[in-house]
Structure formats: C-alpha cells, structure tokens
Amino acid sequence: MAENSLKEKTAKGLMWGSIGNGAQLILGTLFGIFLARLLSPSDYGMVGVLQVFILIANTIQDSGFRMALANRKEVRHEDYNAVFWFNVGSAAILYALLFFLAPFITAFYQKSDFAIDHDLSALTPLARFCFIGIVTASLGTAHYAYLFRTLQVKQKAIITITSLSISSLIGITMAFLGYSYWGLATQGVAFTVCNTVLFWHFSKWT
C-alpha cells in the first residue's frame, strides 16, 4: 500500500514537473518574442549589464543554505527560521552595498566602450530598482526549500507558471506603453515578488 502511494506520488511529481518545465519553456518563448518586437537591443543591454551583479549577490545571500535545508535529514521549525533571517539579512546588506555602488557601476560603463543608444546616467536609478529583486527573492528562499523538501511539485509548477505569466504581461504592457528598458526591469522584479508571495501562500511552516 505504501509502495503504491509512493509510486503514485512519484508519477504525479514527474507529471507536474514536466508540465511546469514545458509551460515555462513555451510561455517564456512566446513572451520573449513579444518583448523582442517591442524593445531594442539597447534596452536589453541596459538591464543585461546589471545581471552579473544580481547573480553574484543572489549566490552570496543564498550561500547554499537553501539546498542544505532541503536535503537535511531532519529539519525543525527553527532551522527554517534561521535560514530565512540569514538570507533576508544578507540580502538587505547586499542591497545597501549595491545601492551605494550604483553610481560607480554607472561611471564604469560610461568610461568603457559600451555601445548603447541610451543615456547611461539612467543606469544608477535602474540598478537600484533592479537590485530590489535581491531582497524580494530572499524572502522566499526558505519557503522554496520547504516546497522542495516536501515534494510539492504541483505547487512549484503553479508558482512558476503564474509568476512568469503575470510578470511577463507587466513587462509587455510597460514596453508597449513606451517605458522601454524599465518594462524589462519591472518584469524581473515582478517575477521575484510573485514567486515570493506564492511561496509564502503554499508553505505551511510559517
């Protein structure tokens, strides 16, 4: 009986995992095509140059605790709390640091031979806005670990599809209204916000 239940859970997990990955690929491609028709390469360049800083910051604030929590043999409520507050605290510090460094990042690209049609002075406010995603993502790190650990594949698929759809529609709408790279930046932040809100909704340890 227990073996059949395990097989059933595994089959459902594989099914929802496939649905989530397939939907993410299809929706990501479709929304990407729409955005590409509305935005210029320079728009993508304005946001793209900031991604390396976001990637590094996210790697530092996570520090492997998410997967360690997900793979630990036994996890207590206090363990989730500890990881949650560590990630939030780290993200807040990193955001404050990057907020301060934003003008220097702008100056670096202004001095380099960076071929882009936009006024690079706009990189400072754009960077400070994009870096907000570091903090919002940290608020859902422990919750993601909970969903991963408890094999809630269906919920993860729903979260991915919903977050991608909402954030992409926001980005496309803003791009259509003429906000150019701000639409792309808002899409990224909106995705992390939607993810985090839904992680909290489906996680019961809080």
Indicate residue ranges for each PLM-predicted region:
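Transmembrane alpha-helix boundary signature
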Residues: 66-67, 95-108, 138-148
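Signature of the first transmembrane helix
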Residues: 6-65, 90-102, 110-111, 128, ...
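Helix-loop junctions and terminal segments of transmembrane helices
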Residues: 59-77, 148-149
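Helix-capping/transition residues at the boundaries of transmembrane alpha-helices
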Residues: 36-39, 70, 106, 148, ...
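N-terminal membrane topogenesis motif
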Residues: 1-28, 67, 75-85, 120-124, ...
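Substrate-agnostic recognition of the 12-TM MFS/MFS-like secondary transporter fold
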Residues: 81-90, 140-164
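Helix-loop interface residues and adjacent transmembrane-helix termini in multi-pass membrane transporters
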Residues: 38-41, 77, 120, 150, ...
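C-terminal transmembrane helix end/exit motif
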Residues: 66, 142-149, 153, 176-177, ...
